[in-house]
Regions:
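C-terminal catalytic ATP-binding subdomain
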Residues: 1-18, 49, 141-148
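Charged docking surfaces used in two-component/phosphorelay signaling
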Residues: 40-48
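Helix N-cap/capping motif at the beta->alpha junctions
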Residues: 55-68, 88-91
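Active-site beta3 strand of CheY-like receiver
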Residues: 71-78
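Active-site residues of response regulator receiver
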Residues: 80, 111
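Receiver (REC) domain active-site loop signature in two-component systems and cognate sites
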Residues: 83-86, 95, 127
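Alpha4 helix (beta4-alpha4-beta5 surface) of REC/receiver domains from two-component response regulators
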Residues: 90, 103, 114-129, 142
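A Lys-centered signature of the CheY-like receiver
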Residues: 133
Length: 148
C-alpha cells in the first residue's frame, strides 16, 4: 500500500510541477463560486503560482467587489455559472457594463457545465474563456498563461 501511495504522490507532484513553476506574483485573481470547498481548492491551487487570490460567494458579491475596487486591482476572474443570488452570466453582463477597464476585465467560466454549447454560451455572454470542473491543471495553466 505504501508503494501505491508513494507512486500516487509522485504523479500528483509531477502533475502540479508546471503550474507551481509559473510565477504570477503581483497578479490578483477573483474566484467566484457559491461552493465553499470549490473556492478553497481554487485558492490553494492558484496561490501555488504566487498570485493573490480573493473570493466571492456569488455573482452579486463579485460585481460589488469589482465595482468598488481600485482601477486595475483584478487581473482575472474565474466565474462559476450556477450560483444563487446572481448567476455567472448575469454577473458577467453586469461587469461588462462597468465603465473603463473594469468592464474589460478578463472573465473565464469555471464550471461543471462543460458541453460545447456551454462553452459557446459563456463566450456569447461576454466571457473570455471556459474551463471545466474538476480542474485540469494543464488547461488551468494554459488559461493563466493566456490572460496573465
Amino acid at each position: 500500500r505504501q508503494f501505491t501511495s508513494d507512486r500516487k504522490e509522485k504523479a500528483a507532484r509531477n502533475y502540479l510541477q508546471k503550474l507551481s513553476e509559473a510565477d504570477y506574483t503581483g497578479k490578483r485573481i477573483l474566484v467566484v463560486d457559491d461552493n465553499e470547498l470549490n473556492r478553497e481548492i481554487a485558492v490553494e491551487i492558484l496561490q501555488m503560482t504566487g498570485a493573490e487570490v480573493e473570493t466571492a460567494e456569488n455573482g452579486k458579491a463579485a460585481v460589488e467587489k469589482v465595482e468598488v475596487s481600485p482601477k486595475g486591482l483584478y487581473d482575472l476572474v474565474f466565474m462559476d455559472i450556477q450560483m444563487p443570488v446572481m448567476n455567472g452570466y448575469e454577473a458577467t453582463a453586469a461587469i461588462r457594463s462597468l465603465p473603463g477597464e473594469k468592464g474589460k476585465l478578463p472573465i473565464v467560466a469555471m464550471t461543471a457545465n462543460a458541453f460545447a454549447e456551454d462553452v459557446q454560451l459563456a463566450k456569447n455572454t461576454g466571457m473570455n474563456g471556459h474551463i471545466a470542473k474538476p480542474l485540469d491543471m494543464n488547461k488551468l495553466n494554459d488559461v493563466l498563461e493566456s490572460w496573465l
